[in-house]
A protein has these predicted regions:
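Short, conserved catalytic or interaction motifs in soluble domains
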Residues: 37, 56, 66
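Recognition helix of helix-turn-helix/homeodomain-like DNA-binding domains
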Residues: 27-40
Length: 68
């Protein structure tokens, strides 16, 4: 299930690195990196935490694209 995300883009807008983002939402830098690369899909709870820190909606960051 491909989950597209704009986490890196939004994170850069608030000038926060992966380590800082991880600390803000309670995960490791590696988890943030995996999410940005598309190697890991966050839980609903984590997606909501990320959206809250970035002050955007979950839909602004993450989008689902059906495989054709």
């Amino acid at each position: 299930m491909p989950l597209n995300n704009r986490l890196k883009e939004y994170r850069a807008k608030i000038n926060v690195n992966q380590t800082e983002m991880g600390n803000l939402v309670g995960v490791s830098r590696q988890t943030i990196s995996q999410i940005e690369r598309g190697d890991y899909s966050p839980s609903v709870t984590l997606a909501l935490k990320i959206a809250k820190v970035l002050n955007v909606s979950v839909e602004d960051i993450f989008s689902y694209e059906e495989e054709k």
